[in-house]
C-alpha cells in the first residue's frame, strides 16, 4: 500500500470520526428538542403521508385549541382562528417572522429573514403607496410577457401553466423591479426563475437533516451552490445600475421603480451586495407565489368556463378599450372576486402567519396554553378557507362569491382580494401582512385581463381540474398538467 493511500485513509478516518461525532451530537440535540416539545400539554399529530387529512382530523377534534403537527424535519404548533388576533400585532421580540423565514428559507444563502430595514421600508411604504406606478409597468410589459410564453397560436395549443407563468411573473416583476433592458435578458430571467426553485429544492433536502448538521451539509448541495452563484451574478448585473449616468431617460420608460426606491432608502447609497440582497428578497417573494397563483387562475378559467363571458363583459364595459389603470382597476369587481375565490380554494399554504416564539416567557393563548420560546407556530388557513360558517357551500367554486357579497349595503370595500382579516389570512394579517399583496393582486388582474380579452382557454378533452400538490404545508399547482389556448379571432 502506498504512502499516499495511507494518508488518504487516515484523512478519511479522521473526517469520518468528525462526521460521526457531529451526527451523534446533532441527533442528540434534535431528540432533546423533540422531547421538550412532546412534553407540552398539547395534542400531537404526526404526518405519515397525507398532511391535509391529518390537519382536518386534528381540527375536527380540537377546533378551538392548538395542536402540535409533526412533519419531516419540522414540528410546530398549529393555532386555531383565535390565534390570529393574538399574534397579528406582536413585535419581533415576542414572535418573529424573520427568524422563521431565516430558518425555513435558508437565510444564510438566500438572505431570507436577514435584517434589512431598507428593504422592509421600501416594501411596506414605497411599494404600497406607489402601486399605481408599478401598474403602469405591468401594462407596458404584459403583451410581451404573455406572447413570449404562449405566442399567438391560431389553433388550440397545449401549454403547462406553471412553467409559462413562472416566466411571465419574472418578466412582469422584473420590469417593475429593475426595468429594461435587464428585465428581458434571458440569463437574468432564467436565473430569477431558478432562484425560487433552488430555494425550495434545497429546503426539501435539508429539512430531513438535523439542524445542527445543516451548515456542514448545505455547502455541498448543488442547489445551495447555485444560490451562491446567483447571488454573485445578481451583484454583478446590478452594479452598473448604481451609476447615476445609467439612470438617464429611465423616467420616460415605465419600469425599474423598485430599484429606485431601494436606492433612496440608503442615505449613502447601497452597495452592490445590499442591492442584490434586496432584489433577491423581492424576487423570491413575488415570483414564487405569483407564478403559482397565476397557474391556479388559468386552471380555474379552463375548469369553470361559465365565468369567462361575464368576466369579458365586465372588462369591456369598464375598460372601454383602454388599458388597466389606477381608476378602472377598482371597478373590476368580478375579476377581483374570481381571483380571491381562486386563492381561497388554492391558497399558498395550509397554514399561514408563520412565527417563532421569541419571548422567553413564551406565548400565552386564550385557550390557556403557553407555547414555549423557540417553538414554531402557524395559524390554520385551510379550515378557515373552508369554514361553512363563513362561506356557504365552501367546497364549491363560485367565482363571483365575493362580488355578490360586496353588493350588500355596507360591504362595498369589504371582501376584496387584497383585504386581510380574521376570515382571510392567505396574505397573512396584521403587522406582517404581505406588503406586496396589492402589487401581486394588480399584476394578476393585468395578466388575467390580457388573457381573457385575447385568448380562448379550455382544458384538454376528458381532463378534470388538475389537483394540488402538497410539500409539507406548502400548496403548489400540478407542474405537468396542461391547458389549451388559442388566440381569439
Curated annotation (Swiss-Prot):
Q: Where in the cell is it found?
A: Membrane
| Glycan attachment residues as annotated in the record | 289
State its cofactor. heme
An example GO CC term for this entry is: membrane
For this entry, the protein name equals Cytochrome P450 monooxygenase ataF
Q: Which organism is it from?
A: Aspergillus terreus (strain NIH 2624 / FGSC A1156)
Q: Which GO terms describe its biological process?
A: secondary metabolic process
Q: What kind of membrane protein is this, topologically?
A: Single-pass membrane protein
Q: What class of enzyme is it?
A: oxidoreductase
Family (UniProt): Belongs to the cytochrome P450 family.
Q: What does this protein do?
A: Cytochrome P450 monooxygenase; part of the gene cluster that mediates the biosynthesis of acetylaranotin, a member of the epipolythiodioxopiperazine (ETP) class of toxins characterized by a disulfide-bridged cyclic dipeptide. The first step of acetylaranotin biosynthesis is performed by the NRPS ataP which produces diketopiperazine cyclo-L-Phe-L-Phe via the condensation of 2 phenylalanines (L-Phe). The ataC domain of ataTC then catalyzes the formation of bishydroxylation of cyclo-L-Phe-L-Phe.
Q: Which domain of life is it from?
A: Eukaryota
Q: What is its main location?
A: membrane
**GO molecular function annotation:** heme binding; iron ion binding; monooxygenase activity; oxidoreductase activity, acting on paired donors, with incorporation or reduction of molecular oxygen
Q: List the disulfide bonds.
A: none
Quote the Pfam families the UniProt record gives: p450 (PF00067)
Q: Which CDD domains match?
A: CYP503A1-like
